[in-house]
Amino acid sequence: DSWMEKMGLTTRVGIDIPGEILSLIPSPEWKERVKGEPWFLGNTYHLSIGQGDLALTVVGLHRSLLAIANGGELCELGIAKDPRCTNLKLKKDNIELVKEGMIGACSPGGTGYTFFDFTPQAGCKTGTAETNEDGKTHAWFSVFAPSESPEIMATVLVERSGEGSKVSGPLAREIFDYWFHP
């Protein structure tokens, strides 16, 4: 299994609202079939940093990052149902390494500057996704807190609006301020 499959990015998340679509995870076969072009090493590089033809859904990315935050459980997402979770059997050291990186992103020197002074400590992932529109990017920001035992996680996406830390980060901060400091 690829890591994309293991983290649930190649299947629907099972959310109980209509209209869910699959993320697009490009492959050499997909590129040849859809674009009539061969796969180059540069395509692999772009895929590894979340660029190029990769198109993740908000709920798909949220669910995969939630599995890091909660210690390795990949859960169905839902509005009005209890989630069913599957243990991914990831090495605890690997989960902790990624989680530490996400905590670092929300700490001074990281990219999630809207959470540098937040208590309790949070972990986050910022993103600026290409759109194939001239100079337009989607702003992503995923965050969970408290970092040691998360009770809330949010993923904010603002389409065609700029950088995740600049645009979506402040919106996520408002949600977390309301949750932790009403």
Residue ranges and their predicted role:
Residues 1-161:
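Beta-lactam-recognizing serine transpeptidase/beta-lactamase-like catalytic domain environment
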Residues 57-63, 167-174:
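Short amphipathic alpha-helical face segments that pack within enzyme cores
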Residues 86, 171-182:
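Short, gly/Ser/Thr-rich active-site loops of penicillin-recognizing serine hydrolases
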Residues 162-166:
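Ordered, soluble secondary-structure elements with a strong preference for glycine-centered loop motifs
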